[in-house]
Curated annotation (Swiss-Prot):
UniProt signal peptide: none
Stretches for region Disordered: 42-79
Protein name: Sec-independent protein translocase protein TatA
Originating gene: tatA
Annotated source species: Shewanella denitrificans (strain OS217 / ATCC BAA-1090 / DSM 15013)
UniProt function note: Part of the twin-arginine translocation (Tat) system that transports large folded proteins containing a characteristic twin-arginine motif in their signal peptide across membranes. TatA could form the protein-conducting channel of the Tat system.
Keywords: Cell inner membrane, Cell membrane, Membrane, Protein transport, Translocation, Transmembrane, Transmembrane helix, Transport
HAMAP family: TatA_E
Family: Belongs to the TatA/E family.
InterPro entries per record: TatA/B/E, TatA/E
Major site of localization recorded for this protein: membrane
Subunit structure: The Tat system comprises two distinct complexes: a TatABC complex, containing multiple copies of TatA, TatB and TatC subunits, and a separate TatA complex, containing only TatA subunits. Substrates initially bind to the TatABC complex, which probably triggers association of the separate TatA complex to form the active translocon.
Length: 79
């Protein structure tokens, strides 16, 4: 009643194909697919950059903690 049936969708698709042609629709679909792929790649690279930065920060913190512990142990050995 209030919804769109499959037949109505098919008629709309047929009209769109007749108006624009298959070549133009194919190129439009390719452009849209490329845009979605580029967006996904950007999101993935942004996430991996954040993970790399967090890993570097944690390694720097561990290194500084180890550097602080080493002089104390040397002082104890010398005393």
């Amino acid at each position: 009643m209030g919804g769109i049936s499959i037949w109505q969708l098919l008629i709309i698709a047929l009209i769109v194909i007749l108006l624009f042609g298959t070549k133009k629709l194919r190129s439009l679909g390719g452009d849209l697919g490329g845009a979605v792929k580029g967006f996904k790649n950007a999101m993935t690279s942004e996430t991996s950059e954040e993970e790399k930065k967090a890993l570097e920060d944690s390694q720097t913190a561990q290194t500084s903690q180890q550097a602080e512990k080493k002089p104390e142990s040397k002082d104890k050995e010398q005393a």
